[in-house]
Swiss-Prot record:
This is tRNA N6-adenosine threonylcarbamoyltransferase. Fe cation binds at residues 111, 115, 300. It catalyses: L-threonylcarbamoyladenylate + adenosine(37) in tRNA = N(6)-L-threonylcarbamoyladenosine(37) in tRNA + AMP + H(+). It comes from the Bacteria. Keywords: Acyltransferase, Cytoplasm, Iron, Metal-binding, Transferase, tRNA processing. Binds 1 Fe(2+) ion per subunit. It comes from Hamiltonella defensa subsp. Acyrthosiphon pisum (strain 5AT). GO terms for cellular component: cytoplasm. Belongs to the KAE1 / TsaD family. One of its GO terms (biological process) is tRNA threonylcarbamoyladenosine modification. Substrate binds at residues 134-138, 167, 180, 272. It is found in: Cytoplasm. The gene is tsaD. InterPro entries: ATPase_NBD, Gcp-like_dom, KAE1/TsaD, Peptidase_M22_CS, TsaD. Its cofactor is Fe(2+).
Length: 333
């Protein structure tokens, strides 16, 4: 089965084709980072308009890359939420129209479920159940995954998502949007002993997160110190270390509470090398295994939507022709 996947939840237009026998056949991605950088964040109206401009050429390029004709597509999967409503409607409308024109099923996909499944695109599929740590610009969640579509939320951020905290702190350090990856690069040159930031909520029971206080601690430190290059590196190191330690502590706590030995790391922040390394060490010590995707499949992309669509079809998921999107959509719903 060949599934065309469409991703337009925020500021990336992604289109891909996944073949259930051959794997990923084609993957095209257009990023709007340069468009939004001058505003310091995503402008929803501009994002929607840019998706409209790029989506059809990307679909054509994807079909060409895969050497596949429309008649050889068996289903169309598209992101139905969560995300920016205008951006979601672009992908949903095009996806539905193509499915109708090609007389194939249309499959709405939950964006965070697609992130959760992304490591399985190329790696072995972990046995159920397992713990998933979902870390992105809009979400920070610990989820027990019992089967496709059967999710139990164990903990989540009570305020800022971890990716949002990275980007906001990067902005305070004078880095361009999106600054999370730049902050991680600065941190490589940081002095590990100069600043120490709090690890939020690790002394409380439960698996929820909070990053607003950590962001405030970073902001106060930035204001209190001269902003030479080394100081910026030192602050970046302290911030990143605090975030990674917090995520690792909560993840290990989730594993202990559930007795599980498999951990999936997914979402844009899962591309962070120090986070990957930290969790790999923890899972090795626990005689378990951590799964994560290649960096290119950690951020938003069409490949994860195509794959998630195929997995949903295997579970019997189908949809009518109505165009329905969900800007807010709990994974457990």
């Amino acid at each position: 089965m060949r599934v065309l996947g469409i991703e337009t939840s925020c500021d990336e237009t992604g289109v891909a084709i996944y073949d259930s026998e051959s794997g990923l056949l084609a993957d095209q991605l257009y990023s709007q980072v340069k468009l939004h950088a001058q505003y310091g964040g995503v402008v929803p109206e501009l994002a929607s308009r840019d998706h409209i401009r790029k989506i059809v050429p990307l679909i054509q390029a994807t079909l060409k890359e895969a050497c596949v004709s429309p008649q050889e597509i068996d289903a169309v999967a598209y992101t139905a939420g969560p995300g920016l409503i205008g951006a979601l409607l672009v992908g949903a409308s095009v996806g539905r129209a193509l499915a109708f024109a090609w007389n194939v099923p249309a499959v709405p996909v939950h964006h965070m479920e697609a992130h959760l499944l992304a490591p399985m695109l190329e790696d072995q599929v972990p046995d159920f159940p397992f713990i998933a740590l979902l870390v992105s610009g809009g979400h920070t969640q610990l989820v027990q995954v019992n089967a496709i579509g059967k999710y139990a939320l164990l903990g989540e951020s009570l305020d800022d998502a971890v990716g949002e905290a990275f980007d906001k702190t990067a902005k305070l350090l004078g880095l361009e949007y999106p600054g999370g990856a730049m902050l991680a690069h600065l941190a490589q040159q940081g002095d590990p002993d100069r600043f120490i930031f709090p690890r939020p909520m690790i002394d409380r029971p439960g698996l929820d997160f909070s990053f607003s206080g950590l962001k405030t601690a970073a902001a106060l430190t930035i204001r209190a110190n001269h902003q030479d290059e080394q100081t910026r590196c030192d602050i970046a190191y302290a911030f990143e270390k605090a975030v990674i330690d917090t995520l690792a502590i909560k993840s290990e706590r989730a594993l202990e509470q559930t007795g599980l030995t498999r951990l999936v790391l997914a979402g844009g922040v899962s591309a962070n090398e120090k986070l990957r390394s930290k969790l790999s060490v923890i899972m090795h010590e626990r005689q378990g295994k951590v799964f994560y995707a290649r960096p290119q499949f950690c951020t938003d992309n069409g490949a994860m939507i195509a794959y998630a669509g195929w997995r949903r079809i295997q579970e019997g998921s189908r949809s009518d022709l109505s165009i329905s999107v969900h800007p807010k959509w709990a994974l457990s719903q």
